[in-house]
Amino acid sequence: MKIYKKSILVCSCTLAIFTLAACGTNQNQTMEKQDKTTIQQDKTDKVNYTGTYSNLNSKESVEDVRKALAAHLDKDSVDTFFNLVNDYNATVGSVGLTGDFSTFTKTEYDVEKITNLWTPKKGDFVGTNCRINSYCLLKNSIEIPNVEKDDSLLFLDNDAIDKGKVFGAEDKDAFDILFSRVKTEATTDVKVHAAKMEQFLSQFKFNENARMLSVVVHDDLDGQSLFIGHVGILVPSEDGYLFVEKLTFEEPYQAIKFATKEDCYKYLDTKYENYTGEGLAKPFIMDNDKWVQS
């Protein structure tokens, strides 16, 4: 098992020290509202999911994904997101990024080559990660309460936001609240941690159609806490569901088409299941404010 320290945890969905960091519904239909009880994931065939993916490195894939996102999110947010996508791909897109959707298998990216293309053009702005991009998409369609924040694990995110002038002070404050560290107990029991995360996220009003799927990790370096180490947005599409994510600061955007939302849960669950350590609970998935049991 991989034992992560604070620097590794914070970099989930960031500087490649830690790779965590990071059907059948019509596009015009709304995604069914989740029950108020915990979401159950089918325990059979856990790793059996299929999909197609794109790094949004073609006009056709961008138009396809834009259409799916625009059906459930405001134009300004979608435009802001694609400005970030286009800037990233224009800078590093020559490093084998896919355009048209193709069969989704395990993806690996040459971070060294990407960095060598990015840094000379962008300097000390490291780019954006999963949390920044997810917030850009959701910020106008969710309600974030004015509650106390703990942004101690967001210093890399906030530095990138400032240096890249991604958004202003008000949005930055809301971002820090949404992705705050959450206090928890010293236990490996995921149920305990999931209840803490559900309680915290219940304060927010989420978009029922553009859903925030989060991978929550447990950390014990500076007290017992929970942190959204990876996050992306799931929307209904013409062929099922579309999941949009930015893997890390260096690694690219991925738009993945799944037949069912359960397939997306399985993708996240299996991709990040080993990011834990001795005495720590395994990562778990949240769909908006509900725990997805695996």
Q: What feature does the model see in each segment?
A:
Residues 14-15:
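Repetitive helical segments and hydrophobic/amphipathic motifs
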